Amino acid sequence: MTKVIMNGCNGKMGQTITEICKADADIKIVAGIDLYDGIDNDYPVFSSIDKCDVDADVVIDFSNAKAVDGVLDYCVDKQVPVVLCTTGLSDEQLAKVEECYKKVAVLKSANMSLGINTLMALLKKAAQVFAPAGFDMEIVEKHHNLKLDAPSGTALALADSINDAMDNEYHYVYDRSQRREKRDPKEIGISAVRGGSIVGEHEVLFCGQDEVIEFKHTAYSKAVFAKGAVEAAKFLKGKGAGHYDMADVIAAK
């Protein structure tokens, strides 16, 4: 069984992970970290991770950027692997994460969904077939009207997976409104839609002469990210120092 400290346990994602772990005999949350203590959990909750005195195999972090430094310090000091799901880190924090790779196991991915990460692997293979055959590649991502960034980090990660497979020969185009020229064969177009309560939808098109191949992933709730984090925690238990991602989790299955 994998014993977990859930940092950000009383947030939406923390509570979703709590419920998933209750139904899984192979993993258990043994302690939580959260400033807000208004939820009755079946594990002890501490206001900060440095106050936690419970032994664990892995830390799952779904909190906020301000808390990440303390989490990293704790995990390095205690030699506890960490699944780092918090986004919006500063350049200084990202540099600190890079340093932590040398000292403890850290799993960090642009998207925790098993589906998205499987899609990335499929796109690498598809690009190697379709790109040399002259197919154009476009990505369309859709999210709710409260999302601040565009394009999404996941859309960029999908584009990167294609580009990596093609020796980084492609550049990204986000806006064609100011251009009056033919499409560059070496571009990947990325378009963003914002509306309603769309959790997350990503579509990748390979457009050739007389045929179009589409890959699509739709997230109907944020539970897909929570499930991925749980699988990542199981995978990370006992791992040595280094940078891991969801591709490693999928490869191990």
Regions found by a protein language model. Name each.
Residues 29, 45, 82-83, 106:
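Hydrophobic beta-strand scaffold residues
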Residues 73, 77, 86-106, 117:
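Rossmann-fold NAD(P)-binding glycine/threonine-rich loop
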Residues 81, 96-113, 130, 135-136:
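Rossmann-fold dehydrogenase core element
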Residues 118-134, 150:
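Rossmann-like NAD(P)H-binding beta-loop-alpha module
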